[in-house]
């Protein structure tokens, strides 16, 4: 079911493959799209509560890839991310369903091959050390600048609006001309 390997990548990784899984590839892809790019812990939590039947075999393959990373590659399980995950079509078994008046319909029992590659990436908190705070600081400074500019413009426009409103109300009352 599983194979440990290292693909050429910038991060250390491990791989697991489940072949001939008794679910169609299109149904497996519905579940796979939920967890692509997530951390392994988050992906397993999502799959634990997903109602689709394909969530169980996909969760098994992700757990197997995480175990391969920890045991074979010596990677920290808390830093693992589902980097690549895909489902390919496997062989299709054909069966016959008898129908009325001597007819028969074909049943296609589809299988799939599910491949998962997990990478050990530094946590988001660790990556934000210097560059993230400067970007956040720049964003805060831009926001303050735009707030200050809006505050300078706001009183002028509100006083103009107030004068226009006063003139309109005076005319409506039939006041000074």
Curated annotation (Swiss-Prot):
Domain of life (superkingdom): Bacteria
Q: Name one Pfam family in it.
A: Ribosomal_L22
- Which GO MF terms are attached to this record? rRNA binding; structural constituent of ribosome
Sorted alphabetically, the keyword list is:
Ribonucleoprotein, Ribosomal protein, RNA-binding, rRNA-binding
Q: Which GO terms describe its cellular component?
A: cytosolic large ribosomal subunit
Under PROSITE patterns, the record lists:
RIBOSOMAL_L22
Q: Where is the composition biased (Low complexity)?
A: 145-167
Q: Record's SUPFAM superfamilies?
A: Ribosomal protein L22
> Ranges of Basic and acidic residues compositional bias?
121-130
Any GO BP annotation: translation
Which residues does the annotated region (Disordered) include?
118-177
Q: Which PANTHER family match?
A: CHLOROPLAST 50S RIBOSOMAL PROTEIN L22-RELATED, LARGE RIBOSOMAL SUBUNIT PROTEIN UL22M
Subunit composition and interactions: Part of the 50S ribosomal subunit.
**Family as reported in the entry's similarity comment:** Belongs to the universal ribosomal protein uL22 family.
Q: What is the role of this chain? A: This protein binds specifically to 23S rRNA; its binding is stimulated by other ribosomal proteins, e.g. L4, L17, and L20. It is important during the early stages of 50S assembly. It makes multiple contacts with different domains of the 23S rRNA in the assembled 50S subunit and ribosome.
Matching entries from HAMAP family are given as: Ribosomal_uL22_B
| Name this protein carries in UniProt | Large ribosomal subunit protein uL22
Q: What is the lineage of its organism?
A: Bacteria, Bacillati, Actinomycetota, Actinomycetes, Mycobacteriales
Protein's gene: rplV
């Amino acid at each position: 079911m599983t194979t440990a390997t290292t693909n050429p990548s910038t991060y250390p990784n491990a791989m697991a493959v489940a072949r001939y899984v008794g679910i169609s590839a299109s149904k497996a892809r519905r579940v796979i799209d939920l967890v692509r790019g997530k951390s392994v812990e988050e992906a397993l939590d999502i799959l634990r509560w997903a109602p689709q039947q394909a969530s169980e075999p996909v969760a098994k393959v992700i757990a197997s890839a995480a175990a391969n990373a920890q045991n074979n590659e010596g990677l920290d399980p808390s830093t693992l991310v589902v980097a690549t995950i895909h489902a390919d079509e496997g062989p299709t078994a054909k069966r016959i369903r008898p129908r009325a008046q001597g007819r028969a319909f074909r049943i296609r029992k589809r299988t799939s091959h599910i491949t998962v590659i997990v990478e050990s990436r530094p946590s988001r908190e660790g990556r934000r050390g210097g560059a993230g705070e400067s970007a956040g600081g720049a964003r805060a400074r831009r926001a303050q600048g735009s707030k200050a500019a809006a505050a300078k413009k706001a009183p002028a426009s509100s006083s103009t609006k107030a004068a226009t409103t006063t003139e309109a109300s005076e005319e409506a009352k039939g006041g000074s001309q």
